[in-house]
From Swiss-Prot:
The keyword Ion transport applies. This is Major outer membrane protein P.IB. Belongs to the Gram-negative porin family. It comes from Neisseria meningitidis serogroup B. It is found in: Cell outer membrane. Transmembrane segments: none annotated. GO terms for cellular component: cell outer membrane; pore complex.
């Protein structure tokens, strides 16, 4: 009897040790096709087409926490890409961190979503192609090796600050400062995310002395309806004298409504003509994405979408169309 009790206790130890560890992830893949036409004058200068089986952002992760007493908890997460095409390698290449959580809020260090990225509900699409998601306005979003503090919520309001060091910025070699806030009241919400960078290297021959970005998102979200509008403004002062100023303002909107198991969705984005080298330049764009999800269950959904993007206007423009179908499973 005593031996049986000892054996049962020993067998339970690994289970107890892993009780606070959660395995989670998403597998999503599909087929996408696209066609892009570059115009030069009245004629098409080049046409590119493509169709392929693609991974739509699959991931796998482990997370957990430990109660340290007095309301303080240690929290951790290790998350990585898990492409069905087998093209991803390495651990912790998505959001991965260790930190502390308590009544003071949450303090983490690791590879973390930027504050700007956490306002990214304006782009809810699962896609590989840039033409099947509002990816141009989402381009500045990133995960940074950084330290981040998130405050607790007070009357629906919470805030975040984040700092990324020079030596962790990789090829960009730029320290950056980030801040934002969230406000919720019933289904209504307002989000702000901003960043400021110094000595940012874009390419080998393009260096930015100062860069800042601001995004404001507002909308309504409940179990059936999601509606959101975003405005984003970027401004960069380049080091080279002949490229002294570069700025652009962008807007986007997304609307979705759930009918039973089906959720149709539409997004629109527009980039206003920006300033490059102190002169107007045709970097404006318009983009539309439409699609729907069908839920077979709480975990498995079918995806379908179509997109259109036009960059520039007049005789010199770039027009792309795309379509895709896919399947997503969460665990």
């Amino acid at each position: 009897m005593k031996k049986s009790l000892i054996a049962l206790t020993l067998a339970a130890l690994p289970v107890a040790a892993m009780a606070d560890v959660t395995l989670y992830g998403t597998i999503k893949a599909g087929v996408e096709t696209s066609r892009s036409v570059a115009h030069n004058g009245a004629q098409a200068a080049s046409v590119e087409t493509g169709t392929g089986i693609v991974d739509l952002g699959s991931k796998i992760g482990f997370k957990g926490q430990e109660d340290l007493g007095n309301g303080l908890k240690a929290i951790w997460q290790v998350e990585q890409k898990a492409s069905i095409a087998g093209t991803d390698s390495g651990w912790g290449n998505r959001q991965s961190f260790i930190g502390l959580k308590g009544g003071f809020g949450k303090l983490r260090v690791g590879r973390l979503n930027s504050v700007l990225k956490d306002t990214g509900d304006i782009n809810p699409w699962d896609s590989k192609s840039d033409y099947l998601g509002v990816n141009k306005i989402a381009e500045p979003e990133a995960r940074l090796i950084s330290v981040r503090y998130d405050s607790p919520e007070f009357a629906g309001l919470s805030g975040s600050v984040q700092y990324a060091l020079n030596d962790n910025a990789g090829r960009h070699n730029s320290e950056s400062y980030h801040a934002g806030f969230n406000y919720k009241n019933g289904g209504f919400f307002v989000q702000y995310g901003g960043a400021y960078k110094r000595h940012h290297r874009v390419q080998e021959d393009i260096n930015i002395e100062k860069y800042q970005i601001h995004r404001l998102v507002s909308g309504y979200d409940n179990d059936a309806l999601h509606a959101s509008v975003a405005v984003q403004q970027q401004d960069a002062k380049l080091v080279e004298e002949n490229y002294s100023h570069n700025s652009q303002t962008e807007v986007a909107a997304t609307l979705a409504y759930r009918f039973g198991n089906v959720t149709p969705r539409v997004s629109y984005a527009h980039g206003f003509r920006g300033l490059v080298d102190s002169a107007d330049y045709t970097n404006d764009y318009d983009q539309v994405v439409v699609g729907a999800e069908y839920d077979f269950s709480k975990r498995t959904s079918a995806l379908v979408s179509a997109g259109w993007l036009q960059e520039g206007k007049g005789k010199n423009k770039f027009v792309s169309t795309a379509g895709g179908v896919g399947l997503r499973h969460k665990f």
